[in-house]
Curated annotation (Swiss-Prot):
Annotated BACK domain residues: 133-237
Entry's localization field: Nucleus
Signal peptide, first to last residue: none
UniProt protein name: Kelch-like protein 15
Function: Substrate-specific adapter for CUL3 E3 ubiquitin-protein ligase complex. Acts as an adapter for CUL3 to target the serine/threonine-protein phosphatase 2A (PP2A) subunit PPP2R5B for ubiquitination and subsequent proteasomal degradation, thus promoting exchange with other regulatory subunits. Acts as an adapter for CUL3 to target the DNA-end resection factor RBBP8/CtIP for ubiquitination and subsequent proteasomal degradation.
InterPro entries: BACK, BTB-kelch_protein, BTB/POZ_dom, BTB_POZ_KLHL15, Kelch-typ_b-propeller, Kelch_1, KLHL15_BACK, SKP1/BTB/POZ_sf
A cellular component term, taken from the record's GO annotations: nucleus
Effect of mutating residue 136 to A: Decreased interaction with CUL3, especially with the neddylated form of CUL3
Record keywords: Intellectual disability, Kelch repeat, Nucleus, Repeat, Ubl conjugation pathway
Pfam families named in the record: BACK, BTB, Kelch_1, Kelch_6
Species annotation: Homo sapiens
């Protein structure tokens, strides 16, 4: 590869002027300057050099001693490099190879011929591979080149190939401590399991015994909580650096504590447990296809805007609610198939960990609930009201993540189901829903700072305390709608309005409303093009996405609508349709490590 030659041609070279100078040059006419480099002499035209190079223009037009000289000695570049640069100035073309690019880049930088510098950068980026990465890295460092983002592109290659590069002696020799630290701190390394990054660091340290003094500092950029317990025990604790580094022993102890306290992991938010991920993925936990329940398989909306299905464990639940705590997903309640083959309200709670693509069943809620609402405040997940087939609730309970237990708190003011809940400013807002009489416009907010005592909370029949407070009602009564907080406001989308409670006759409510907590006012916004209920909602790229659901024409949807809050406009077909028509889906944005996504890519 080193001998491969590639030609580059200038697109801005003035052909008419250059042709004239080229003819004079070839005939040896009117040459008025000789440039001496090493033991070689190059004759040229001052005027041509001045038009092509800022370096020569200043030399020949400013008050410099070389202006009137006919022989000029240039130092700091090679004759080989300058001969190619001089050819470019006359002919507008240049040939580059790995054997010559170093000297040509040196000469181009010297005489400030930026176009040739760009050609050299393009050539190097096209040629970069594992075998010559260290050489290219050294070359760019030698000349401090960063034209057209060449360093960023080189770093992208390095991050994408970090582990295999760290097995190469030439790369290990050249990679500095500072560069290694910057790479280990970069979330784009997520395509490699953390244990592989640790082994790569070991290779760098072993390459030169003098590097061991950096061990404690480097180790702090390895995220041991992302490893498996087996990897920590078998590959980290057995290494010579475990005995050498006090910081490594501390990090391992932290990781082992993290592994042991399974239920508390969402609250142990520290650098060593955070996924290396630059951008979250819109994630759909599948609910219903028509009237058939689907296990909670996972769909990912991935660029270039296609849907991937994430293979892995499934949970036998059609969840009604989703809660996110530090990139862990909790799916709560909803419906599950009973032994009689019928759907029943569920008390089950499952937690999904995208780090390992794994599920864990948590403590059940105190009572089965479907069509209820949840919200996360601090270390608690609140579950509000809801129903079973035979009973409607007003009870409210909360899940303590630290001890994997549920306890009752101050109940909602009335029995209700089909409502929606969202947390804003550390308060849980509940909107709409169905009461014993009709669909509701009610908005009620739960303030945990006003909760009663433990003794009060244990009495399920207690009277309502001042924990719940009514706010201004929505403009439209609705149930089975969706609500999301965005930029300090609450947005409500779709749903239905029950007209006759006895027959459950209903009509669609396609309207959109926004709530401003500072003024306690609701404002009507542009209605959805196609009203729906049972849909999912999330925010992506400053737009609110509405996915799937049951449309008012009676058909289940696989489409995605997007709402721009700034312009108050709806758009359709901005994103590809989901691979199936879904109702009751739960949607969120999750960070996944790239090694999980790579496996998804292979399966799709």
């Amino acid at each position: 590869m080193a001998g491969d030659v590639e030609g580059f041609c200038s697109s801005i070279h003035d052909t008419s002027v250059s042709a004239g100078f080229r003819a004079l040059y070839e005939e040896g006419l009117l040459l008025d300057v000789t440039l001496v480099i090493e033991d070689h002499q190059f004759q040229a035209h001052k005027a041509l050099l001045a038009t092509q190079s800022d370096y020569f223009r200043i030399m020949f037009t400013a008050d410099m001693r070389e202006r009137d000289q006919d022989k000029i000695h240039l130092k700091g570049l090679t004759a080989t490099g300058f001969s190619h640069v001089l050819q470019f100035m006359y002919y507008g073309t240049i040939e580059l190879s790995m054997n010559t690019v170093h000297e040509i880049l040196q000469a181009a930088m010297y005489v400030q011929l930026i176009e040739v510098v760009k050609f050299c950068c393009s050539f190097l980026l096209a040629k970069i591979c594992l075998e010559n990465c260290a050489e290219i890295m050294r070359l760019l460092d030698d000349f401090g080149v960063n034209i057209e983002g060449v360093r960023e592109k080189l770093d992208t290659f390095l991050l994408d190939n970090f582990v295999p590069l760290m097995s190469r002696p030439d790369f290990l020799s050249y990679l500095s401590f500072e560069k290694l630290m910057s790479y280990l701190d970069n979330d784009h390394l997520s395509r490699f399991p953390e244990i592989e990054l640790y082994e790569a660091v070991q290779s760098w340290l072993r390459h030169d015994r003098r590097r061991w003094r950096h061990t404690d500092t480097i180790i702090q950029n390895i995220r041991f909580c992302l490893m498996t317990p087996t990897s920590v025990f078998e590959k980290v604790k057995t290494s010579e650096f475990y005995r050498y580094s006090r910081q490594l022993r501390y990090e391992v102890d932290q990781a082992l504590n993290y592994f042991q306290n399974v239920h508390q992991q969402p609250l142990l938010d520290m650098k060593s447990s955070r996924i290396r991920s630059a951008k979250p993925q819109t994630t759909v936990f599948r609910g219903m296809i028509g009237h058939s329940m689907v296990n909670s398989k996972i769909l990912l909306l991935k660029k270039p805007r296609v849907w991937w299905e994430l293979e892995g464990p499934q949970v036998p639940l059609r969840p009604d609610c989703l809660a996110i705590v530090n990139n862990f997903v909790f799916l709560l309640g909803g419906e599950e198939l009973g032994p009689d083959g019928e759907f029943h309200a569920s008390s089950k709670v499952f937690r999904y960990d995208p780090r390992q693509n794994s599920w864990l069943q948590m403590a059940d809620m105190s009572v089965p609930r479907s069509e209820f609402a949840v919200g996360v405040i601090g270390k608690f997940i609140y579950a509000v009201a809801g129903r079973t087939r035979d009973e409607t609730f007003y009870s409210t309970e909360r899940y303590d993540i630290t001890n994997d237990k549920w306890e009752f708190v101050d109940p909602y003011p009335v029995n209700k189901y089909g409502h929606e809940g969202t947390v804003l400013n550390n308060k849980l807002f509940i909107t709409g829903g169905i009461t014993s009489s009709s669909t509701s416009k009610q908005v009620c907010v739960f303030d945990p700072s006003k909760e009663g005592t433990i003794e009060q909370r244990t009495r399920r029949t207690q009277v309502v305390t001042n924990c719940w407070e009514n706010k201004s009602k929505m403009n439209y009564a609705r149930c089975f709608h969706k609500m999301i907080s965005y930029n300090g406001k609450l947005y409500v989308f779709g749903g239905v309005c029950v007209i006759l409670r006895a027959s459950f006759e209903s009509q669609g409510c396609p309207s959109t409303e926004v709530y401003n907590p500072e003024t306690d006012q609701w404002t009507i916004l542009a209605s959805m093009p196609i009203g729906r209920s049972g849909h999912g909602v999330t925010v992506l790229d400053k737009q609110i996405m509405v996915l799937g659901g049951l449309c008012y024409n009676g058909h289940y949807s696989d489409s995605i609508l997007t709402f721009d809050p700034d312009e108050n406009k709806w758009k359709e077909d901005e994103y590809p349709r989901m691979p199936c028509k879904l109702d009751g889906l739960q949607v969120c944005n999750l960070h996944f490590p790239d090694y999980v996504l790579d496996e998804v890519r292979r399966c799709n």
